Amino acid sequence: MAAQNEQRPERIKTTPYLEGDVLSNDSGPLLSVFALQEIMQKVRQVQADYMTATREVDFTVPDVQKILDDIKTLAAEQVYKIVKIPSISFRHIVMQSRDRVLRVDTYYEEMSQVGDVITEDEPEKFYSTIIKKVRFIREKGSFILHDIPTRDHRGMEVAEPEVLGVEFKNVLPVLTAEHRAMIQNALDGSIIENGNVATRDVDVFIGACSEPIYRIYNRLQGYIEAVQLQELRNSIGWLGRLGQRKRITYSQEVLTDFRRQDTIWVLALQLPVNPQVVWDVPRSSIANLIMNIATCLPTGEYIAPNPRISSITLTQRITTTGPFAILTGSTPTAQQLNDVRKIYLALMFPGQIILDLKIDPGERMDPAVRMVAGVVGHLLFTAGGRFTNLTQDMARQLDIALNDYLLYMYNTRVQVKYGPTGEPLDFQMGRNQYDCNVFRADFATGTGYNGWATIDVEYRDPAPYVHAQRYIRYCGIDSRELINPTTYGIGMTYHCYNEMLRMLVAAGKDSEAAYFRSMLPFHMVRFARINQIINEDLHSVFSLPDDMFNALLPDLIAGAHQNADPVVLDVSWISLWFAFNRSFEPTHRNEMLEIAPLIESVYASELSVMKVDMRHLSLMQRRFPDVLIQARPSHFWKAVLNDSPEAVKAVMNLSHSHNFINIRDMMRWVLLPSLQPSLKLVLEEEAWAAANDFEDLMLTDQVYMHRDMLPEPRLDDIERFRQEGFYYTNMLEAPPEIDRVDQNTYEIARLQANMGQFRAALRRIMDDDDWVRFGGVLRTVRVKFFDARPPDDILQGLPFSYDTNEKGGLSYATIKYATETTIFYLIYNVEFSNTPDSLVLINPTYTMTKVFINKRIVERVRVGQILAVLNRRFVAYKGKMRIMDITQSLKMGTKLAAPTV
């Protein structure tokens, strides 16, 4: 080993990527991009078979580093707001009356403006609108009150008027002094009470809030008051176990501070991550593989062994004719070095990435390359037993190459006794008649390759991630051993290597046997490093589950295709020699190693939110078939994806699998029960619970057609008229009598339209002063206020669309029920100069559309009822209290260098 410390002479750089013993540096994200490019080339070959000639698919390779940065940004986002003043829930419209005003629930007013207009023939737009409305509820109600403005009144702490959630300042100027005093007395009674929540002092007061918004606020407050202490202990305890496995210490700096009495803390994410959530995503095996590489794989160098090993074994003679001696001085090209990367990726992800030989006409002409690859391939790869690094075809090609090498007797002739089968390696060699059949690949037992007579998969102490309990032991090496490259590997060996040395000696290849004997310590260090990388750094939620891992090899042999098929990468013959002569030596651990659990938790949480959204949307077609006549499951899949964070979509679609996901994949995923608990998921489920009543989303199927005259009152007493606060609306206080309602379904409308009697039938119903309800289709409802005559398209608008045209001598009719409906409020304003008939027209104005929603959107109230909506209990944290999101503490860790790195 002293030769390694000798002063080496300067070497001329023949290639830009060769520098001494170091060939190149590869980091996790860099290797993930490289792996993604190579994998995509294989995936595209399969995907191209499914593409039609006109279908365009974007096959650009995504930027993995940018995706990870976006997910980290997503983890820093808060799903709640910390505010001093809650949003206004009720506002008032001043009328000419001194004791009456219109009270408007601003939630319904704002909700009516969210989303697009629903139509029957655009189900994707309907699903997208529902998602937007549910998101509006969640975001509107996700607030925490902190340091609310208060004032002192006679020694009592009283809430400022803007905290109460009612806007009434525009009403005060028109009130009498008596009414203003009454409101002031009510405001002075808004006393702040001292409360105690989770051993923390808080302010409690009564305010106003709309029901759906308050449900979200109440759920968020309950989440905080539940303290999440056990969840935090579980997360920190699990991080400790993970840190021990991955050699990471997680900082307790933040956690020593949050227990103070002046701190309110919120834990928005939880650990450990439920791996089932990540692996249930359809066609996600490749995306998870890339994420595993990007977040966990260390940066490393490709180190060459001591050059004296080959000089004193393979090239000691002046003339060298052996295949090994010929290749000893060769230098890899850039493409061959890429193949070396593929080989080490396959070794680090056994079973998930397997290798095959690429067809290279140039190398078929050089038998020395094939022979050498046949020998080193049996020492580099595992083919069977529990997993494989090779395809069956490549294993057979390596067997044939080893067969040719053993029979290539360039030094001395050795006796050969051939077997009866004609299979590769079916012969015995040497004086002791060594049976070479044992080196022929057998995927059932692993014979002939590294897994031969070796326990290369072990289950021992429980791993932090429950889905991946296996420990990989290439060459039988235990990854818990500490590696000192100067001494490690000396005196170590394993069965396949011993048998290879015996067979080479029996074949008369003494120089090569001496070379491999000298390379054994370097070879053992190589696989010891790989074992440590697999069992420590690469252990994550993106690791392949044990049940899938155990099924990879049997499925490969049987030709069965499952959810996680292996990725096959092509390598050249000569790259096996270069891979054998290079070892991947980790130099720096992955930059994202300590924050990987947080990235995983964010990703799983967002997937759970998407799954909950899809479950509810999948029920829509059964609840409202009239508005989703043409709906397919792919529509709500696309709607949820469009409204999901870009980073999460990018991870799910790393291999462009979304272009090929079918309905079976989607529905299977939606129905699977696995979810990742988080604050965002809790609030999303509560928002859907609030949205189960579609009237809270300003959608209704209670829309009627009825001819009604717009009121034109005589102004005999203007003062009395003004005091009554006269207004008109097409909003019904109750549905019409059922015996006066004609249910006009699509089938009835089509029949009448075919007979050319659709308009006549409706006219007859209107003349009888009856009502028509057009199907059970949901409609988008808008709320508008007018203090003058509304436009005719609102006053005389019909709750359906009916168009006729003629083409080719035939008459066609188009009927649509899902149109936008407007609830309007017309406030009458008069002046003392008006005459009694100022509002009277010769011809009356008719309104045709009536709407019934069982919600108090707008109501006329007396002045004394302005504050009657103060009926919600609010909890506000005092200004001197700190509200701290301790989610970020789950990533505050420091990587420990391996003792020998």
From Swiss-Prot:
It is found in: Virion. It comes from the Viruses. Its main location: virion. Keywords: Capsid protein, Inner capsid protein, T=2 icosahedral capsid protein, Virion. InterPro entries: Inner_layer_core_VP3_Orbivir (IPR002614), Inner_layer_core_VP3_Reovir (IPR016029). One of its GO terms (cellular component) is virion component. Signal peptide: none annotated. GO terms for molecular function: structural molecule activity. It holds the Pfam family Orbi_VP3. Belongs to the turreted BTV-fold inner capsid family. Inner capsid protein that self-assembles to form an icosahedral capsid with a T=2 symmetry, which consists of 120 copies of VP2, with channels at each of its five-fold vertices. This capsid constitutes the innermost concentric layer of the viral mature particle. Homodecamer; each decamer is made up of two conformers of VP2, called VP2A and VP2B. 12 homodecamers assemble to form an icosahedral capsid. Function inferred by structural homology with BTV-fold inner capsid family. This is Inner capsid protein VP3. It comes from Bluetongue virus 13 (isolate USA) (BTV 13). The lineage of its organism: Viruses, Riboviria, Orthornavirae, Duplornaviricota, Resentoviricetes.
